Amino acid sequence: MAFIAALGLLMAGICPAVLCDGTLGRDTLSHEDHGKGRQLHSLTLASSNTDFALSLYKKLALRNPDKNVVFSPLSISAALTILSLGAKDSTMEEILEGLKFNLTEITEEEIHQGFGHLLQRLSQPEDQVEINTGSALFIDKEQPILSEFQEKTRALYQAEAFIADFKQPNEAKKLINDYVSNQTQGKIAELFSDLEERTSMVLVNYLLFKGKWKVPFNPNDTFESEFYLDEKRSVKVPMMKIKEVTTPYVRDEELSCSVLELKYTGNASALFILPDQGKMQQVESSLQPETLKKWKDSLIPRIINDLRMPKFSISTDYSLKEVLPELGIKKVFSQQADLSRITGTKDLYVSQVVHKAVLDVDETGTEATAATGVATVIRRQPRTLNFNRPFMVVITDMDSQSILFVAKITNPK
């Protein structure tokens, strides 16, 4: 299973650009900063990230109720948090509060140190699961950027920096798209379809996740089957299946849905939410951080006699400039934006926010291992789960409890 996402923030200049030498600063985190980052209560960061993820999901799903939804809240919030390093006063507050941080309980410094530490930890090489995340700044060769901003983005977020000539928009676009394509192993080949000549800076964040099921599906068992888009329409899809698998499961009668957890080798898991026929909107409207917590706390290892799930690859792209203001992030898109901690003057605002994501789900997995508690589970009535209608997926890093990706599959074909 692979999940790939990239987000680009495009900043345009209000005033004419001023010539600068373009030297890019570099620094590293001090031991003291590392300590502070680790001291940040991980639940505070995870709680805010979860709240933002579900709030954004509702906005995206509401705009296109019958369309697939795939996005990485972590990639989006990482880019916006980096942007907030360059923002001041109400512009900065809007960004961080829009990301669901309570600034009366957590300081800006703690947010950056905690977030930076989280992204560093996620990118540590691991044998069992591949998570690759990073950020890059593409700065116009004639745009003065404060060395303090460059140093902080490098020290806290390991953001790479490149000089671009936005007066040659096609060349600049190729530079950015080639970078993103390379970092996402070719899965996202074109993050930007066009750039404006007055672009001063582009901020990019990408996140690539590749996980192997702890209990894999056998490719020889995959067969063609119906996936019901609604009560009247269906499409043929390759359907994976596995029999007699023990995995965490809960039935939520109140919300009319079944919830199944499939674990990856390593420290990630996927929560699959299968609403009863016609109940997707009911489940979506009830989605809150408390709902996810209730499901996770209620999961119990159960024998699933017959589990069926479509094999698919879907991609989505969003312009978030219209969506983020609905979450309170408004000023940064206007000429009243104060991004003076980037340039020293109020000459920048955000003109585009582009997010693209790709989700691949297949049978791939390592050697199957029995789930904990198999011997203690009492078999009752046969339990079958058939994901042959719209469902949701939430992929979480278990160590930090951070949501990496959220998806709704309405049509896997």
Curated annotation (Swiss-Prot):
InterPro entries: Serpin_CS (IPR023795), Serpin_dom (IPR023796), Serpin_fam (IPR000215), Serpin_sf (IPR036186), Serpin_sf_1 (IPR042178), Serpin_sf_2 (IPR042185). Liver. GO terms for cellular component: extracellular space. Residues 1-28 form the signal peptide. Glycans are attached at residues 102, 182, 220, 267. Keywords: Glycoprotein, Phosphoprotein, Protease inhibitor, Secreted, Serine protease inhibitor, Signal. Residues 365-389 are annotated as: RCL. One of its GO terms (biological process) is response to cytokine. It is found in: Secreted. The keyword Phosphoprotein applies. The modification Phosphoserine is found at residue 30. N-glycosylated. Pfam families: Serpin. Induction: By growth hormone. Reduced during acute inflammation. Its main location: secreted. CDD domains: serpinA3_A1AC. GO terms for molecular function: serine-type endopeptidase inhibitor activity. The single human alpha1-antichymotrypsin gene (SERPINA3) is represented by a cluster of 6 individual rat paralogs. Belongs to the serpin family. This is Serine protease inhibitor A3L. It comes from Rattus norvegicus (Rat). The gene is Serpina3l.
